Structures are given as C-alpha cells and as structure tokens.
Amino acid sequence: MILSRLEDMKAEETVTIDLRGKSAFSDYMVVTTGRSNRHVGAVAENVAKGLKETGVKGIHIEGLPNCDWVLIDSGDVIVHVFRPEVREFYNLERLWTQNTATAKTV
C-alpha cells in the first residue's frame, strides 16, 4: 500500500531497505523524494491517510509543516520523504546499507 501511494503521488527515487536483523525499531525503511516542500508534505499526508484507512494504529509523523524531511513511523515500516538536497545530505541509504546490498529501488 505504501509503495502504491508513493507512486500515485509521483514520489521519486523510492528505495526500500530491509532492516530485519539490523534494527529493533522497524522491519523496513522506505526512502523517497518529493520535488518541493509542498510535494513532500502532500506525499507524507497521503501515505499517512492510507495507513489509517487500512487500520494501522499509532502512526507518528514528524517534520510537518516544514516539510524538508517528513518521517512517518507506522511501527513495522518507517517512511522518510525528503526534498532532494536534504536526502542527498543525510544519505540514509548509505548509512543503512553500507556493508550489504539490502536497498532496492522500486
């Protein structure tokens, strides 16, 4: 559901990272890019709405209303929506996949 929402909202360069066995706080991380602050916010709100509609409880969202980087924590999956330059600066994909090939572009 998350990936289809990201695709519908025209999020760019979406990558999924398998965190199982690496992290106690989540099983998967999804990293994606929005073209502007407004796009980042719209993408994040659309994903959060979809999670709520499917019955996910306890969703936490950080980064609104600034929308440089919005994090959606749904428990098993964490979604990061970045503006391009912010994503490049933090480079989470490198941080979490440095020694393995667990990042997959979708």
Tell where the protein language model's regions lie, with residue ranges.
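Active-site beta-strand termini and strand-to-loop segments that position acidic
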Residues: I72-S74
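Short beta-strand segments
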Residues: R20, S26-M29
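Long, contiguous binding/interaction regions
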Residues: M1-G21, R38-A42, K49, T54, ...
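Short hydrophobic/aromatic beta-strand micro-patches
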Residues: V31-T33
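Short beta-strand micro-motifs in enzyme catalytic cores
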Residues: Y28, D68-V70
